[in-house]
Amino acid sequence: MANIKAKKYYSYAKINLFLHILNKRTDGYHNLQTWFTFLDLKDQLTFSFNNSREINISSNISIAAKQDNLVYKAIKKFQQSYRVQDIGVDIEIKKNIPMGAGLGGGSSNAATTLIALRDYYLPQLSNEEMIPLAAKLGADVPIFVYGKSAWAEGIGEILYHKDFSPQYALLIKPDIHISTKEFFTSEDLIKSSVLISKDLGFDKSIMHNDFENVFYAKYPEFSQYLKELDSDFRMTGTGSCFYLLSADKNKLEQLARKINKSLDKWLVKTLNYVY
């Protein structure tokens, strides 16, 4: 077993270039199609393994209690799946990825935790071998274990490496939110009925986020505000973060200066690889 003390890992954000919701499965989940790419917006997790047999998690922001925390759940799933006993670790999470944004911050932290545990306890285990375990923690966790831009199907666990031409991204996050349950039960949700080929290039005319209609129907004023800024803003995941892609950084910088000061915003770059 490796002797690792206070090892730091970066935990990156993602965006969905599109998100199509398909049929409901017998297990209650929905099949989907999406294309993930990463952002250089990232959290930092520091793992200090020890012999205490205790799991301690701290952060620079208020975080969920252990039983509701995805990092803690990742540790317990790792223990159960690989029969690793008596894990002792202190984890410090420095959060930069906003929560409740659709950027996958919590899922990314969970995936980073699986990777740190693997590095310490089972270094022979590959990232790909951990994807089935990651899927048990949530639909977005597998892509962060995979670590490469990818086309995803199933509930997000069937992944095909697919690069996306690097761009700058302007992120906008309003202080509003819709629960996942509300999205799926909304009358404004129009699910996609046709599978599209993973061999397609990025085509905004047929690739969209099925959840956007729900968000716009509930918040029409924000919808209108976005369209006035630029009609190509898109929602990632279930929001509430929207992004605009461009190869022209100056264009996005100019637009950022026009954004209402009540909105959080970031100017970042897309990444095809995070490991």
UniProtKB/Swiss-Prot annotation:
Key word Nucleotide-binding present: yes
Any one GO MF annotation of this record: ATP binding
Coiled-coil intervals, chain numbering: none
EC numbers on record: 2.7.1.148
InterPro entries found in the cross-reference section: GHMP_kinase_C_dom, GHMP_kinase_C_sf, GHMP_kinase_N_dom, IspE, Ribosomal_Su5_D2-typ_SF, Ribsml_uS5_D2-typ_fold_subgr
Record's keyword annotation contains Nucleotide-binding: yes
Top-rank taxon: Bacteria
Enzyme class: transferase
Residues reported to bind ATP: 98-108
Pfam family, one: GHMP_kinases_C
Keyword terms, alphabetized: ATP-binding, Isoprene biosynthesis, Kinase, Nucleotide-binding, Transferase
Reaction(s) this enzyme catalyzes, per UniProt: 4-CDP-2-C-methyl-D-erythritol + ATP = 4-CDP-2-C-methyl-D-erythritol 2-phosphate + ADP + H(+)
Pathway entry: Isoprenoid biosynthesis; isopentenyl diphosphate biosynthesis via DXP pathway; isopentenyl diphosphate from 1-deoxy-D-xylulose 5-phosphate: step 3/6
Residue positions of the active site: 14, 140
Example GO BP: isopentenyl diphosphate biosynthetic process, methylerythritol 4-phosphate pathway
The protein's role, per its UniProt record: Catalyzes the phosphorylation of the position 2 hydroxy group of 4-diphosphocytidyl-2C-methyl-D-erythritol.
Family according to the record: Belongs to the GHMP kinase family. IspE subfamily.
Protein name, as recorded: 4-diphosphocytidyl-2-C-methyl-D-erythritol kinase
